[in-house]
């Protein structure tokens, strides 16, 4: 699989922790997700099989396969990922997921097939998500390179897509011989712009996402 692995965005994930003598809980950074540059591949209508070929609106549509690489930050030895969710939401409600595929792998090593439970959400909608959980929580998720895959269904006259990236993780930390879990998430989704020609940019925002 040929996709760019250059880091273009890092989403820092925070939880809120109560501090003694502090009136309000404070934000504590727990982990991060780094995203590479997405690649775009046109999908022809004649490549479809089954019911998709019978759609009466095919002449008014275009379809794109988008590959989007991401990496989990490597955690200290006393911490592990017990789950991770990465989500994409498009601003144009006419841009929807025709199909969402489990993450592929852009680095050598064994696949997640037997060690990770993967759920995908959002077919037919402009908001889609990948949920990753280890089959054995005691092992955690490995911080390896993965690639999100989605086939988008959009109007034929659309040339540029805008939307946001977000992420959430459950992180376990060992304290005094036991693991405590906390949910950490990006504070504000990071806005982006993606052209059907593959051009891509992170847009200015007050987000906690950090362009690299």
Q: Model regions: which residues?
A:
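An N-terminally focused, membrane-permeabilizing/fusogenic/translocator signature enriched
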Residues: 1-102, 199-212
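Membrane pore-forming effector domains from diverse proteins
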Residues: 97, 104-211
């Amino acid at each position: 699989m040929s996709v760019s692995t250059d880091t273009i965005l890092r989403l820092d994930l925070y939880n809120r922790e109560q501090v003694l003598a502090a009136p309000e809980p404070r934000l504590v950074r727990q982990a991060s997700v780094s995203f590479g540059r997405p690649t775009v591949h046109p999908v022809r209508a004649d490549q479809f099989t089954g019911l998709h070929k019978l759609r009466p609106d095919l002449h008014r549509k275009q379809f794109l396969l988008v590959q989007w690489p991401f990496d989990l930050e490597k955690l200290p030895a006393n911490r592990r990922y017990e789950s991770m969710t990465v989500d994409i939401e498009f601003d144009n409600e006419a841009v929807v997921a025709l199909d969402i595929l489990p993450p592929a792998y852009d680095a050598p090593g064994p696949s997640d097939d037997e060690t990770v439970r993967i759920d995908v959400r959002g077919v037919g909608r402009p908001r889609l998500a990948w949920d990753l959980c280890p089959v054995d929580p005691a092992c955690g998720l490995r911080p390896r390179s993965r690639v999100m895959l989605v086939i988008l269904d959009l109007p034929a006259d659309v040339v540029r897509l805008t939307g946001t990236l977000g992420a959430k993780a459950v992180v376990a930390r060992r304290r005094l011989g036991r693991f405590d879990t906390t949910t950490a998430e990006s504070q504000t989704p990071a806005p982006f712009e993606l052209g059907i020609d593959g051009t891509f940019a992170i847009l200015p925002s007050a987000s906690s996402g950090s362009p690299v």
